[in-house]
């Protein structure tokens, strides 16, 4: 344990500023308090850049996901079980931008935690809750897309509003109960008492997680990931087969006679493709962080602080990516944004506006 503590502390001493950017001599987070954490502040230039980059991510996550939620909840055309899942996912990303990223920005740039011990624990709970809630939502969305693509005509009777509500409830309750229970019972610190003692200082917010719980955390990420990869592989095969069938039929009939089933299948495949990109973005953003967590827990916290900070912020930035993906691939979302931004959403009967091209 002593070696593990030494390894961790030596890793923490190689701060992001010392590795990447020149910084002034170390200072204390609280100059007039005994037991204050040490900080190595950035010079003004890099400090301003980091605040701009991290702050932009937080603003984009809040505003972008607020637009997604407003669009889906306001416009009646978007009131579907699948879209309610998307809105709930946007809510998780919105809360990351509101309750996690702004405070992490200050911690990452200043090297200190100025928001109290109570919110330090809440901050960590929010971080875990919203991450797992996102991956559970994406897992259910992938299953929804599989049903829609494999049999689009009976899909409305299988994935109903009730089923969507149960998926949303499960995603939120399990994530919140797990994250808060783990951190508030102190189970994550079992066997790491010496490390926790070494980390404790005024102005710090380091949450230690032992090997057992790091492994469980990784499984909670890995299992839904494998489910999504399997489901989207099947969706890809079905979509490929449907495209081949449509191509064969097009040689025998004119495009004008395209069946209703084919049109529905084409629309569902496009939706599956867009949401598949969102899933891929989530996995690419969070997988490096979880792999690093496993490596750190079993090799004595060897990751330099600047590497950890980079991985954390790549993961955080995922919360800002989905609105950009929707805006790029969904014409209806671009139209909804225009109506919201211009204030036309406040007009009477705006909720029945047609968002889909003829």
From Swiss-Prot:
Gene Ontology MF terms in the entry: trace-amine receptor activity
Manganese as a keyword? no
Keyword Iron-sulfur carried by entry: no
What sections of the protein cross the membrane?
48-68, 84-104, 122-143, 167-187, 213-233, 275-295, 310-333
Q: Which UniProt keywords apply?
A: Cell membrane, Disulfide bond, G-protein coupled receptor, Glycoprotein, Membrane, Receptor, Transducer, Transmembrane, Transmembrane helix
Question: Could you list which ranges are Extracellular topological domains?
Answer: 1-47, 105-121, 188-212, 296-309
Coiled-coil portions: none
| Cellular compartment(s) | Cell membrane
Q: What does this protein do?
A: Olfactory receptor specific for N,N-dimethylalkylamines trace amines. Trace amine compounds are enriched in animal body fluids and act on trace amine-associated receptors (TAARs) to elicit both intraspecific and interspecific innate behaviors. Ligand-binding causes a conformation change that triggers signaling via G(s)-class of G alpha proteins (GNAL or GNAS).
Q: What is this protein called?
A: Trace amine-associated receptor 7a
- Cystine links in this protein are 37-201, 120-205
Q: Which Pfam families match?
A: 7tm_1 (PF00001)
* Entry superkingdom: Eukaryota
Upper taxonomic classification of the species? Eukaryota, Metazoa, Chordata, Craniata, Vertebrata
- Gene Ontology terms: cellular component: plasma membrane
Family that this chain belongs to: Belongs to the G-protein coupled receptor 1 family.
Residues exposed to the Cytoplasmic side:
69-83, 144-166, 234-274, 334-358
Q: What is known of its domains?
A: In addition to the well known disulfide bond common to G-protein coupled receptor 1 family, trace amine-associated receptors (TAARs) contain an unique disulfide bond (Cys-37-Cys-201) connecting the N-terminus to the extracellular Loop 2 (ECL2), which is required for agonist-induced receptor activation.
Q: Write down the species.
A: Rattus norvegicus
What residues are glycosylation sites in this protein? 34, 210
């Amino acid at each position: 344990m002593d070696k593990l503590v030494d390894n961790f502390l030596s890793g923490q001493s190689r701060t992001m500023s010392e590795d990447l950017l020149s910084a002034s001599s170390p200072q204390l987070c609280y100059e007039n308090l005994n037991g204050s954490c040490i900080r190595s502040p950035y010079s003004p230039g890099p400090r301003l850049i980091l605040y701009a980059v991290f702050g932009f991510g937080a603003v984009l996550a809040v505003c972008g996901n607020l637009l997604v939620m407003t669009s889906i909840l306001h416009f009646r055309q978007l009131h579907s079980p699948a879209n309610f899942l998307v809105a709930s996912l946007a809510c998780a990303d919105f809360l990351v931008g509101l309750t996690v990223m702004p405070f992490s920005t200050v911690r990452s740039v200043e090297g200190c935690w100025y928001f109290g011990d109570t919110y330090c624990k809440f901050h960590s709970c929010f971080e875990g809750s919203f991450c797992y809630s996102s991956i559970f939502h994406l897992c259910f969305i992938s299953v929804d897309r599989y049903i829609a693509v494999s049999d689009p005509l009976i899909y409305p009777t299988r994935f109903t509003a009730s089923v969507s509500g149960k998926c949303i409830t499960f995603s939120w309750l399990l994530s919140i109960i797990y994250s808060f229970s783990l951190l508030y019972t102190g189970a994550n610190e079992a066997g790491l008492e010496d490390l926790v003692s070494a980390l404790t200082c005024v102005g710090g917010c380091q949450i230690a997680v032992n090997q057992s719980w790091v492994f469980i955390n990784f499984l909670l990420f890995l299992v839904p990931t494998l489910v999504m990869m399997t489901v989207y592989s099947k969706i890809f095969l079905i979509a490929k087969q449907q495209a081949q069938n449509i191509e064969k039929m097009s040689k025998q009939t004119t495009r004008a006679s395209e069946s209703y089933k084919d049109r529905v299948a084409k629309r569902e495949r496009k939706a599956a493709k867009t949401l598949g990109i969102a899933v891929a973005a989530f996995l690419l953003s969070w997988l490096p962080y979880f792999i690093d967590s496993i490596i750190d827990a079993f090799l004595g916290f060897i990751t330099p602080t600047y590497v950890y900070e980079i991985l954390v912020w790549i993961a955080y930035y995922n919360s800002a990516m989905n609105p950009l993906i929707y805006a790029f691939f969904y014409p209806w979302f671009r139209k909804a944004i225009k109506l919201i931004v211009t204030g036309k959403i406040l007009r009477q009967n705006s909720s029945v506006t047609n968002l889909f091209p003829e």
